[in-house]
C-alpha cells in the first residue's frame, strides 16, 4: 500500500483551493482595506469594499493560476457587463445607467429612505468625496461613480428625518451608528412635515374658504349633535367640553340631566369636530388681515374631576412645589408677597399656575395685573365662577338669544370661558390670556384688551348694531350662528343658601392649604374643600 504523507495532502488541498479561487478575483478583507478607504483621491471611490481590500501579495500568487488572456481589469469589465445585461432585462433605461458591481447600493429613492440601505455595507464602505468626479458617458468602469453621486443627492434630501443625519459626513459615521439609524415609515398619501421649502399637504383637513376672509381668521367650536353631524348613542344632545376655542351644544332634553356627567367626557376623539368662528368684515375688522389663528385639535384626554376655580381653588392631591428661582433680591420678595396677599394657591388653580411660572421671565407685575383683573371680575354679576358647561346651559336654557355668562374654563390651560345663546343653542368659547391681555381669539397681543371687564363691555357695545362675529363649523354646508352679547345673566338674581354664601366668602379669603388649620369641625372643613363653592 502506498503511503500518503502529510506534505502530499497539503499540496493537493492547495491545488483544489486555487482552482476554486480562479473564478473570483477578490478575497476576504485584509489589513490593507483601511488604507484604500482612507485615500479617496487615488481611487475615486469607484471600487467597492471587496476591491479596495485585496491583498497585493496574494494577487501576485493567484496571477500564476489565472489564464494569460484574462487580466484584472478585464475580469472586472466582464463581471460589470454581465451584471448590466441581467438588470437590463427587467429595468428601464434609467435603472440600467445606475447598474454596477454587487458591492454598491441600490439607487432608487424608496430604497435610500428605507432602513435596509442605510444599514447596508455599501454606505459604510464607500467613501464619498466632497467634490465628486463629473458625470460623463464613459465606459462601464465609471458607472459606480455615477451611482455614488446619485446616492449622495438622494441622501441630501431637504425633508427632515434620520436619513438626513447621513448627509453631514459619511466618513464620520461608524457602522454601529449607521445600524441605529431607523427612519420612520412615511405614508404615501401625504407629504411629511418638512422644512420651509417643501410641500406639505394633509388630505384629511378640509378648511373652508370664505370670500373676504382667510383661513387663519377662524376659531373652532364643536358641531351641534341635533343636526346629525356628530351623533352619539343614547338621548344625549350635547357635545362634550373639549379644548377647542369655540364649542356648540344643544339644550339638554328634559329628563336627560343625569346623562351629563363628567365621565361622559371620555369618548373617541373622532366624534368631536373642530370648527371655526369668523368675523363679519362689514361690522368689525379686528381679525381681517391681522391675526393668524391656529386651528387646534381636541385634546387627547379629559380629567374626571369637575372644573376648578382660579379664585377659589380646591385641594390638590399632588401639589407641585413652585418657586421663583429666576428672581432675586426685591423682585423675589415682591413675588412672594403678591402670592401670599392674593390668597391664590398656584399649585391647584388651573390656568393661574402657568401665570405664576411666567413671573420668572415677565416679572411679578404680570401676576399683579392678572390678580387685580380677577378681583374686578369677581364683582361682576355675569361671572359665575367654576360652574360646568352643563350648569351654564341650564342657566341659559330659557333665556333669549344674546344672553351670556362668563365661567371658569374646564381646561387647565385656560382661565375663563364665555357661554352665550344664538339661534336657540348654547355656544361656548374661551377667553385667551397672554401678557396681560384678554381676547376671544388666539392672538390676544394683537387685538386683546387689558381687562376682562373691558373685553365684555366692548363686545356688548359692538352687539348693539347686530352680530359682531359669526361662528361656523369647519364641515362644508354647516350652519352659521351669529354672535351677540346683549343680555348678561347675573348670578345676583339668584339667592343661594346661607351655607353656600359662607363657603363662598371663606374660600375667597382663605388659601386652600390653610382650611385644615381653621377652628372648625371636620365636617365643615370637608364641605369647604369641595370643588364647587
Swiss-Prot record:
Residues 382-489 form the SH2 domain. The keyword tRNA processing does not apply. Residues 76-88 have a biased composition (Basic residues). GO terms for cellular component: cytosol; immunological synapse. Pfam families: SH2 (PF00017), SOCS_box (PF07525). Residues 59-69, 177-189 have a biased composition (Basic and acidic residues). This is Suppressor of cytokine signaling 6. It comes from Mus musculus (Mouse). The lineage of its organism: Eukaryota, Metazoa, Chordata, Craniata, Vertebrata.
